[in-house]
């Protein structure tokens, strides 16, 4: 059997791929303190959940440090959308659902190649809850993604099959939103996919 890939090297490779895709589409990066949103701007807060914080089931290094940054800039936005990874138990993207497979290996699902993850962000668990202390007083909508048991979902706009849409693009356009700021976890996956799909949907996009 092929040895499982080293997690650090694997994530570095994916991060480099996401960075290249971001550079190719010229998505600007903004420091939180320099943001000046207007009434046609929206903030998308991506997956700031316990599962991605230190001690969670799929932790991102310093994943708890995004909370004060987001809290500091949130009051400037009249329009905030929140996403949550919200998997069913036994989700197809979990390594535990595939005999002989380990986390960070890959398999082929109906829509193509899929990275297999540790069980994480299972619906209704504390692991899937938003991180304590996150304060978003003007949040208007929560997009829960990954609840389709057979399809993974990174982006707030489209599932990983690249066919199933969440309706977020229409929601934003109906409210006259032109510019989308994206912040949260993790930059190399759900933040990157959300930002790239926002650009594809016709919005001006900045990653925080």
Predicted regions and their residues:
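A short glycine-rich beta-strand->turn/loop micro-motif centered on a GG-aromatic cluster
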Residues: 181-184, 204-208
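Acidic/histidine-rich helix-loop elements
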Residues: 53-62
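Active-site metal-binding loops of divalent metal-dependent hydrolases
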Residues: 48, 85-86, 185-187
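Hydrophobic "anchor" residues on beta-strands that sit immediately upstream
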Residues: 42-43, 81, 206
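N-terminal secretory signal peptides and thylakoid transit peptides that target proteins
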Residues: 1-18
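Histidine-anchored nucleotide/phosphate-binding helix
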Residues: 192-199
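C-terminal segment of N-terminal export signals and the immediately downstream linker at the start
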Residues: 3, 25-45, 50
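Active-site alpha/beta core segments
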Residues: 68-179
């Amino acid at each position: 059997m092929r040895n499982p890939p080293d997690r650090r090297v694997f994530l570095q490779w994916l991060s480099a791929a996401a960075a290249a895709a971001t550079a190719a589409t010229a998505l600007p990066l903004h420091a939180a303190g320099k943001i000046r949103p207007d009434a046609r701007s929206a903030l998308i807060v991506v997956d700031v959940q316990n599962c991605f914080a230190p001690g969670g089931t799929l932790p991102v290094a310093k994943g708890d440090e995004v909370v004060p940054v987001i809290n500091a800039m949130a009051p400037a936005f009249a329009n905030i959308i929140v996403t949550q990874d919200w998997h069913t138990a036994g989700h197809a993207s979990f390594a535990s659902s595939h005999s002989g497979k380990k986390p960070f290996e890959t398999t082929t699902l109906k829509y193509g190649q899929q990275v297999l993850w540790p069980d994480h962000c299972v619906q209704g668990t504390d692991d899937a809850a938003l991180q304590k202390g996150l304060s978003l007083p003007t949040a208007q909508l929560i997009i829960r993604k990954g609840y389709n048991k057979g399809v993974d979902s990174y982006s707030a706009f489209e599932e990983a099959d690249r066919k199933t849409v969440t309706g977020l693009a229409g929601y934003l356009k109906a409210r006259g939103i032109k510019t989308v700021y994206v912040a949260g976890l993790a930059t190399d996956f759900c933040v990157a996919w959300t930002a790239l799909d926002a650009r594809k949907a016709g919005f001006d996009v900045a990653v925080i």
